[in-house]
Design a protein with these regions (language model features):
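Acidic/polar active-site rim loop that often engages polyanionic ligands
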Residues: 4-6, 92-95, 109-115
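Long, charged alpha-helical interface segments
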Residues: 105-141
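A residue-level structural signature of the nucleotidyltransferase/glycosyltransferase Rossmann-like core
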Residues: 70-71, 121
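Active-site-proximal, substrate-binding regions of enzyme catalytic domains
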Residues: 1-69, 76, 83, 87, ...
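Short alpha-helix plus adjacent loop in nuclease-associated cores
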Residues: 93-103
């Protein structure tokens, strides 16, 4: 489930950028649901309180309205805000690791996905990437 603001930012305004086609296809097939925040005033409050963009505040507010336990976020300030708001936070790498643990993807597939993320501009420290890849290699033995 993603808030309407994320859909607009990623698909409408960001068409052609990484993730736009996948998000569009996910909503078309029903894998991703777009949902509206009911209390729009809270978006402004969260944005000011946590010093995040309105779209990122919308993610946190929608999670609250849906009584979610986990928020998907990669940006550090959004992760911190979501944690402060009481949510467990997962990023792209955490989702990929979970996919191996749940036997959805193989460690080799996830290593390739990590390489693809980095090649497409995903920014994360080399030490984290290298450590994760080493762990995945051990899991594939």
């Amino acid at each position: 489930i993603i808030p309407e603001g994320v859909y607009i930012e990623v698909v409408v305004e960001g068409w052609g950028l990484p993730g736009s086609l996948e998000t569009s296809e996910g909503t078309r097939t029903g894998f991703i649901t777009v949902s509206k925040v009911t209390d729009k005033e809270k978006i402004k409050e969260f944005s000011e309180k946590y010093k995040v963009s309105a779209v990122n505040a919308e993610v946190i507010q929608l999670a609250k309205e849906l009584n979610a336990q986990i928020v998907l976020a990669n940006e550090e300030e959004v992760r911190e805000a979501a944690q402060e708001a009481g949510f467990q936070v997962k990023g792209c790498l955490g989702i990929l690791v979970d996919s191996v643990k749940n036997k959805i993807l193989s460690p080799r597939q996830v290593i390739q996905d990590i390489d693809n993320l980095v090649a497409s501009g995903y920014r994360i420290g080399d030490d984290i990437i290298n450590g994760l890849k080493e762990t995945l290699r051990r899991w594939s033995e």
